[in-house]
From Swiss-Prot:
InterPro entries (alphabetical): DnaT, DnaT_DNA_bind
Function recorded in the entry: Involved in the restart of stalled replication forks, which reloads the replicative helicase on sites other than the origin of replication. Can function in multiple replication restart pathways. Displaces ssDNA from a PriB-ssDNA complex. Probably forms a spiral filament on ssDNA.
Keyword match DNA-binding: yes
An annotated GO cellular component: primosome complex
Gene3D superfamilies: 1.10.8.1180
Species of origin: Escherichia coli O17:K52:H18 (strain UMN026 / ExPEC)
Protein name listed in UniProt: Replication restart protein DnaT
Presence of keyword DNA-binding: yes
Coiled-coil ranges (or none): none
UniProt superkingdom: Bacteria
Oligomer status and interactors: Homooligomerizes. Interacts with PriB. Component of the replication restart primosome. Primosome assembly occurs via a 'hand-off' mechanism. PriA binds to replication forks, subsequently PriB then DnaT bind; DnaT then displaces ssDNA to generate the helicase loading substrate.
Amino acid sequence: MSSRVLTPDVVGIDALVHDHQTVLAKAEGGVVAVFANNAPAFYAVTPARLAELLALEEKLARPGSDVALDDQLYQEPQAAPVAVPMGKFAMYPDWQPDADFIRLAALWGVALRAPVTTEELASFIAYWQAEGKVFHHVQWQQKLARSLQIGRASNGGLPKRDVNTVSEPDSQIPPGFRG
């Protein structure tokens, strides 16, 4: 099992138990990684360093601006959840994948880095509504996962280019060509 140690100071648990004050006093940054059986067990932190970390956490929890935005302007009304039909059904406009869709997609062998966007879902629903085919809910989710995998990989993972922008000439010379 691999692990990452977040401090250069490492000590065995026996040494810490034997003389914890000396170990913590010598620690760079007030933090020591404590190992037990050649594996990281926990971190020992000085009270001063703990106070610094808590102050930093409190500072980061505060908003960066004193301007308060009205939340109701940004919250879209939540639609009432639609019950998933039993058995096979044709695609309908309010269809939604399950809340744990990303996890399910991983189980089906499709690693999705980001959740489905509203645009991707709308495109998927519009296509399959026109097709008129019927599938079970799980099958629809599998089709959505494959569709996202293919759609996102088609451009090397890059977002689609805007067709309305004017292209600019490339001034770089490819490797192997003389300029």
